[in-house]
Amino acid sequence: MVKLLMSWDIKSGAESEYFEFIVREYAPGIMKLGVQPTEAWYTVFGEGSQILTGAVAEDLATMQAILNSSDWQSLQSKLFEYVTNFQYKIVRATGRFQML
């Protein structure tokens, strides 16, 4: 099993629209593609990324196929309307907390 670690900051003034998009489109969309969310962290204080999130897929080939799909690209394009400083990394899932 592999894990997709992602982080980003929400654009100032876009918080309501961002959370609406995440709940109604992004989370259901990535699950439909075969990526299972495992956690999401919202940073209130400090200098780190505002959002840290993780999701798993069965194996690296599956994850890469998902990330290369047009459906994933469409979801990412919509996400980028609400966020900045997007970063991601694919790692082997350990079952423990993992950071980008």
Task: Identify the meaning behind each predicted range.
Residues F45-S49:
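Short acidic/glycine-enriched loop/turn segments that link adjacent beta-strands
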Residues A40-T43:
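Short, solvent-exposed loop/turn elements at beta->coil junctions and helix N-caps
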Residues E20-T38, V56-V91:
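An amphipathic, aromatic/His-enriched active-site/gating alpha helix that lines ligand/cofactor pockets
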Residues V91-L100:
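Short, low-order "capping/linker" segments at domain edges
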Residues A14, A61-M63, R96:
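Residue-level signal for secondary-structure boundary sites
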